[in-house]
Regions:
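Short, well-structured beta-strand/strand-turn elements
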Residues: 193, 358-364, 396-409, 613-619
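Beta-strand-rich, non-transmembrane domain signature
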Residues: 46-307, 311, 369, 384-390, ...
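Sec/Tat signal peptide C-region and signal peptidase I cleavage site
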Residues: 41-45
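Proline-anchored loop/turn motifs at beta-strand termini and strand-loop-strand connectors
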Residues: 218, 604-614
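C-terminal soluble interaction/assembly domains
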Residues: 371, 616-637
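Bacterial N-terminal signal peptides
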Residues: 31-40
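Hydrophobic topogenic segments
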Residues: 2-29
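Secondary-structure boundary elements
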Residues: 305-377
């Protein structure tokens, strides 16, 4: 007697646990399916009163061992105050950001908040696009034997790193931080980019007791000030007199004085099912519409994306890198790539030559180094390698273009008021015919055409071309498909023996290869899969795991022991189920569920029951759809 179970899984769903109960000669199959959704409302705990003074933490702050509003918090931002003002220097405006932060470390993981990073701009090609970070001070306060021990950060703990031709990163570490430490730090960022006000976030991955953003804008600068996020802030706006000294003249005007305050703000935690958690943090966004200085200047700053297109095409460090020589022309000629008729195959073969000669350094960038330096080092960012790939493809007659974007972990691109600052990387799009394009990025180690890392699968990316520029939704490009077939038999002792045949396509194949590559060796990988599936593997074979192709296949001969008694055998037919536990473990979830790409898992199971046994009972299976049909779970016996 055989029973077959069809398990179809589109995207992800709740955990399904099931057992089949077999009994000798007198009963039927018993199938139990348990799906539990628990929604709880958290009660609001009493929280402490914020201390807005810096330099002398209170006894309550020093002795604090947990945060009442979030008992699981590893740390809490006790106070974060940012003042943004305009000043005049050398006859021109600049923006000054004064930032002060106080954090309490509650658990070992919270010590990571002693490591601070401050991004800023220092454009090597434009002296008018420069920022400077100064006035950095940081202190750790610890309570030891009822005495406050104060440890100041020294200058040798401050570092700077150049990310590309525009962007810098300042990093520092607060010393002597441990569980119980109160961290304080402050810095000043001075920016010549007076027409751009940085976004301000009231929340982050730990709860915030108090956050304040104070912004004063002279009447000459017409900004649209927008508040976004899930936790509303208290806002006030007043007019205030301002005075600026320009040479020997005293320039008087009025200003818009904004104040935003947030209290007892919850943590916004990132996870595998949200693109970019900061998109849902409470934040203030300022978009410049125009500048009006009476009798001197009027400038409209309502730029659109066509302006960005033109800038990139004419920029010698971006558009100027196209139509260059192919450094691997001889190797591609030897490989016969130019003679390949199928364009997609030609793109794949070209990419293989690139990856055989250049190694990705693990960094995503927008601007590239010189090709000479990249070729000499044999390594580079995805941008470095993508510039080379564009020229390689052009050399074999494939039309290819850069597709610029902001990665998922940096947030979505703004719909209006764009700037180059919004962009942080690009991929390559290659036309295989007049209407179809394939996508690839040099960071891809284990995939194929149209298989991109999830951070690059954005819904708004822009094709940059002299012919035309347009938007493309890369979420529609990727997919993940897994098909499993289990054929086995159960003996009277409850031992299942059989084979599992699996096919992994597109992003699923890339993940298979990545897991395999990261394992110490094939034996280690095999042991990991055995533990993951709860089986003993007798024989294991794979195909396509080391190839540049869209599919990986494997075959496993296995045994698995089921729970049994003298006259019963309990069987879970989902031997290769993709989920072992509920990924949504939080009591309360305020963020949406966002999947990186469409996913499908299909498992078909055929099991023969032992001779002399019959099915005790069986249920009718289950089918669950979300209201928009974007997720479907189906179990049929």
């Amino acid at each position: 007697m055989k029973k077959q179970g069809l398990y179809q899984f589109a995207c992800y769903d709740e955990l399904l646990k099931s057992r089949i109960k077999l009994i000798t000669n007198r009963r039927c199959l018993l199938f139990t399916s348990i799906m539990i959704l628990v929604f709880c409302m958290s009660t609001r705990a009493q929280t402490m009163k914020p201390n807005l003074k810096f330099g002398s933490p209170t006894t309550d702050e020093l002795k604090m061992s947990s945060y009442p509003a979030d008992a699981n918090a590893s740390a809490v931002t006790l106070c974060k105050i940012t003042d943004v003002d305009y000043e005049v220097m050398s006859g021109d405006f600049k923006i000054v950001y004064d930032v002060r932060v106080k954090i309490k470390v509650l658990k070992s993981d919270g010590k990571d908040y002693a490591n601070v990073e401050v991004p800023y701009i220092n454009d090597l090609t434009d002296i008018n696009a420069r920022e400077n970070v100064n006035g950095i001070k940081a202190t750790a306060y610890n309570l030891e034997n009822d005495k406050v021990v104060k440890t100041n950060m020294t200058k040798d703990m401050i570092f700077t790193e150049r990310l590309d031709k525009q962007n810098m990163l300042l990093k520092f570490t607060v010393p002597q931080v441990k569980v119980g430490t109160v961290i304080e730090y402050k810095y000043r960022l001075e920016s010549s980019l007076y027409y751009t006000i940085n976004d301000w976030y009231a929340q982050n991955s730990i709860p915030t007791l108090y956050a304040e953003y104070h912004l004063v804008v002279p009447e000459y600068f017409k900004f649209s000030i927008e508040e976004t996020g899930m936790s509303p802030l208290k806002k006030t706006m007043n007019m205030t007199p301002l005075s600026f000294f320009v040479g020997s003249d005293d320039l008087k005007c009025t200003g818009n004085d904004y104040d935003f305050i947030g209290t007892e703000l919850p943590a916004v935690k990132d996870d595998d099912f949200v693109w970019y958690a900061k998109d849902y943090c409470s934040r203030i966004v300022a978009e410049l519409r125009r500048i009006e200085i009476p009798g001197q200047l009027y400038h409209n700053y309502t730029a659109d994306w066509t302006d960005i297109d033109k800038t990139l095409i004419t920029d010698k460090e971006f558009g100027g890198r196209f139509h260059k020589s192919n450094p691997y022309k001889d190797k591609m000629t030897t490989a016969g790539i130019g003679k390949i008729d199928n364009t997609a195959d030609k793109v794949a073969a070209t990419y293989k030559i690139l990856k055989e000669n250049l190694r990705w350094d693990g960094k995503y960038r927008f601007w590239g180094q010189s090709m000479k330096d990249v070729l000499k080092a044999g390594t580079g960012s995805n941008a470095d390698l993508n510039f080379v790939l564009l020229n390689m493809l052009e050399d074999v007659g494939v039309k290819a273009v850069p597709i610029v974007m902001r990665t998922r972990d940096a947030g979505r691109l703004p719909l209006t008021h764009p700037t180059l600052k919004c962009l942080n990387t690009f991929i390559v799009g290659a036309y295989v015919n007049d209407t179809t394009m394939v996508y690839i990025d040099s960071s891809v180690e284990d995939g194929f055409l149209n298989v991109l890392p999830s951070k690059l699968l954005v819904d708004r990316a822009r094709i940059i071309s002299k012919d035309y520029c347009s938007w493309v939704n890369l979420r529609n490009v990727a997919s993940s498909k897994v098909s499993m077939f289990v054929d086995g038999k159960i003996d009277a002792s409850g031992l299942i023996s059989g084979t599992i045949s699996g096919s992994y396509r597109d992003n699923a194949a890339a993940k298979f290869r990545s897991d395999y590559r990261q394992a110490k060796d094939s034996i280690t990988y095999c042991n990991q899969k055995a533990e993951e599936l709860g089986i003993d593997i007798l024989k294991w074979q794979t195909s396509g795991v080391k190839e540049f192709s869209p599919v990986v296949a494997n075959s496993i001969s296995f045994t698995k022991k089921c729970e049994s008694s003298p006259d019963h055998v309990y069987v879970n037919p989902l031997i290769a189920a993709p989920i072992k536990e509920n990924p949504f473990s939080y009591v309360e979830r305020n963020l949406p569920v966002e999947f990186p790409y469409p996913q499908m898992f299909n498992e078909t199971v055929s099991l023969s029951i032992p001779e002399g046994y019959v099915v005790e009972s069986i249920n009718n299976g289950v089918k669950i759809n979300t209201p928009d049909n974007s997720i479907m779970f189906k179990y049929v016996i």
